[in-house]
Amino acid sequence: LSDFPSRNATCISISRGPDGEEAFWVGTYDSGLFRRRGRGWEAFGAEQGFPSTSIYCLLANPDGRPSFWAGTRGAGLVAVDPAGWRTLPDHPGIASRQANCFLETQGPGGERVFWIGTDKGLVRWDARGPAMETSAHGLPGEFVTDLLEVRTPAGPEIWASTIGGIARRRGDRWEA
């Protein structure tokens, strides 16, 4: 792997294309996104029209669809699939275009819920749209660095690490 074109790798993921072929993806701090299928690297950066050169996190779709999400600085969350990429539209409920981390969970009715950690709090995006959660909601810090879902006998919990400490969400409440 000494042929990797950047020294600033930030995250890795594997996706499966429509033909079933696996692709290895690497996000970088300053050079965009790279894909490896077989030998050699294919770049997705400013020259290729990718919306950000700073990739902070990657998440393959858990349902096996040939797409994944890239969390970026400046473009927020970007959906990447065989047809190309698209950014989530600006929304007044989101205070930042920096996606440091994210997590996909299921809501009480089985619906998809996205949690996006930003430098200005945590976005919870469900069927109703996005809602920003900050220290006013119980998070110990605004800059969210990582997210984890933990299944417990009492139900699922979301854990968040922030610059300021960690917090656990049970139901609709954060505990720091």
State the predicted function of each range.
Residues 1-176:
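Carboxylate-rich, polar loop motifs that coordinate divalent cations or form catalytic acidic clusters
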